[in-house]
Amino acid sequence: MNLEAWRHRLRARLYEFLRRPDKAIAEYRTALGLDPASAQAARAIAFLLTSRGHYAEAERYFHAAVHLEPQRAATWFNLGFMHDKQHQPAKAIEAFHEALRINPGLDRAWYGMGLCQTALGQHEAAVKSFEQAGQLQPMNPHAWYHLGLAQHALHKQDKVKETIMHLHRFDPKMTRQLIHDTGRSDLSHLVADLRN
């Protein structure tokens, strides 16, 4: 272990805690310079740069991190998230796919992939992704809502109804929004008693 690099990573964590991202990034960069094999430092820099909207620079550090630790699903997910924030759905799908190859139980990667597939008009694939996200997190209203929208885009009205009925069990407000957005006024009685 490189003790000097470790000290800079520790200082960087302190700066993160104190909400001083510029100083944290500088400390992580120093740590990475002292220990170029530190995927932890590369990941942290990429995450901080992404949170500040410096995507091009963040991408370089994400690629360094996945090169150093190619089997870390969370890093691939974060790379996909960054591409999604840049409105690059095809690149995001590639990164989410890699995250899911490593960890098929990563529900947020299924959800992110579904959103990107929807953005590309790949509704059939999006349905499968949202179904996986919903199976892994049965009470995630956003996964079920977007599943319903993808089913609606494919004109699968019976499936939309099933999704609305499932969503109604735990999130009436999101159910009302899905009923509205899919034009399923025949099911509006389910949420007739909701205020605002």
Give residue spans per PLM region.
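Terminal, low-structured helical/coil segments at or just beyond the last alpha-helical repeat
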Residues: 1-5, 11, 159-196
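Helix-start (N-cap) detector for alpha-helical repeat units in TPR-like alpha-solenoids
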Residues: 4-6, 39-40, 73-74, 107-108, ...
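Structural signature of tandem alpha-helical TPR/SEL1-like repeats
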Residues: 17-30, 51-64, 85-98, 120-132, ...
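Structural marker of alpha-solenoid helical repeat scaffolds
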Residues: 34, 68, 102, 136, ...
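Alpha-helical segment of the N-proximal tetratricopeptide repeat
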Residues: 3-40, 44-53
